[in-house]
Amino acid sequence: REFLTPPLDAAQIQAALEKLHSLDDEQPAAPRSARGRIINVLGSKGGVGTTTIAVNLAVELAGGERPASVALVDMNTLFGDIPLFLDLKAEFHWGEITKNIDRMDNIFMGKILAKHPCGIQVLSSPAYLNGHVAPTPETIEHILGVMQQMFDFVIIDAGQSTNDTCLKIVQMASDVLLVSTLSLPCLS
């Protein structure tokens, strides 16, 4: 476990990354058939930087020394920012899946995801109000199960949600990154 407090300097970040990398080297390599890791980036309140951390984590995992297959999921209920952060035009979003959950498989998922030049694939959130169908915990479990079979890492920008769907994501996650700031609203 590593906790970084601001102000951060490059040496502090580098030391934490090297420690993480050395721990990774100690783990035996998993066979490719193993399920991918789900990393849930959850904010203690809005505006703390969950999207920034999720996007940068996904880009680093996809293009680091040991590139991995990475999916980035924007679970902000409406108007998620991941396509904006990546300058990406997403044609589809997870609302399309919730309407067609019976068709969900690797092929359908592959057609829904937006591909970014850095190597990550993005499942964005709806960018409009009409026709929006919120995912249920069961739907999310199915979506993430398919994505775990397709990718080494599934990074989820969960925003600051605390509903049943968010609880299901936390339960399925291999790792949960709770993003906070040193302010009273974040602690309450």
Roles of regions detected by a PLM:
Residues R35-L78, L84:
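Walker A/P-loop phosphate-binding motif and the immediately C-terminal alpha-helix
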Residues G95-D102, L129-P135, S183-P185:
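Flexible beta-alpha connector loops of hexameric P-loop NTPases
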Residues A134, E138-H142, V146-S188:
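Conserved catalytic-core segment of NTP-binding enzymes
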Residues G64-V122:
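Phosphate-binding loop that captures ATP/GTP phosphates
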Residues L8-L17:
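C-terminal output helix
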Residues E18-P31:
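The C-terminal output helix
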Residues L78-F79, A127-N130:
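A short, flexible beta-alpha/helix-coil linker loop
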